[in-house]
């Protein structure tokens, strides 16, 4: 194992093995503790895509608010699951299945197409050409903007689905899906998240679904693994301290070094990590 691989594993707090039921309990308790500390808040908001990560975090969050309501004999605490399509979402059935599994306190739908298209048009009017890839970033940021608007209206915190297998590659939009108040899945790799969903009796098709950010119009439902040039299995093996093929290792470490700026806050005169 290289020194960089060791550093990455330590920085991302990845364990080679987990007890799924214990991880569920630990992360539910984390969500509960944060709300109990911040008494002005009523709960959490998260966009639900119908994929593994948002389904897992949504379920953990709903468990947390249900327990808080029961423990305090109230119905004040809530989880707001948001459907955030751009026009017509091709895998909308998966979102609906995730909602049935989670049973959120509240479900809101905000179609981001009009807002995204307006931003692209305004930028074009200013002489700024937005590529299809950059338009994908506009979609991610518009989704997060909508979540923060809803969170503000309901005195909630915004959750993010960032986990170790995503963080190591920086595979998210800066100030888009990478923005949040809490990231309760941090430290888990992809297969560990799947193990937790199995323990939660989640429908199999939701955690066996091929991961995709689905942000590009020209390449709809582009698989994450194709975009990254490495598989999640290889990423998980790397994060668990196992040996992986040298080309895969170089790809993962290359992503990590290139995306350091995404994992750090705004750079000040006193920061040294970038030098």
From Swiss-Prot:
Keywords: ATP-binding, Ligase, Magnesium, Metal-binding, NAD, Nucleotide-binding. It is an enzyme of class 6 (ligase). Gene3D superfamilies: HUPs. One of its GO terms (biological process) is NAD biosynthetic process. Its EC number is 6.3.1.5. Pathway: Cofactor biosynthesis; NAD(+) biosynthesis; NAD(+) from deamido-NAD(+) (ammonia route): step 1/1. ATP binds at residues 47-54, 161, 190, 212. Mg(2+) binds at residues 53, 166. It comes from the Bacteria. One of its GO terms (molecular function) is metal ion binding. The keyword Magnesium applies. The keyword Transmembrane does not apply. GO terms for cellular component: cytoplasm. Deamido-NAD(+) binds at residues 141, 174, 181, 261-262. Transmembrane segments: none annotated. InterPro entries: NAD/GMP_synthase, NAD_synthase, NH(3)-dep_NAD(+)_synth, Rossmann-like_a/b/a_fold. It catalyses: deamido-NAD(+) + NH4(+) + ATP = AMP + diphosphate + NAD(+) + H(+). Belongs to the NAD synthetase family. Homodimer. Catalyzes the ATP-dependent amidation of deamido-NAD to form NAD. Uses ammonia as a nitrogen source. This is NH(3)-dependent NAD(+) synthetase.
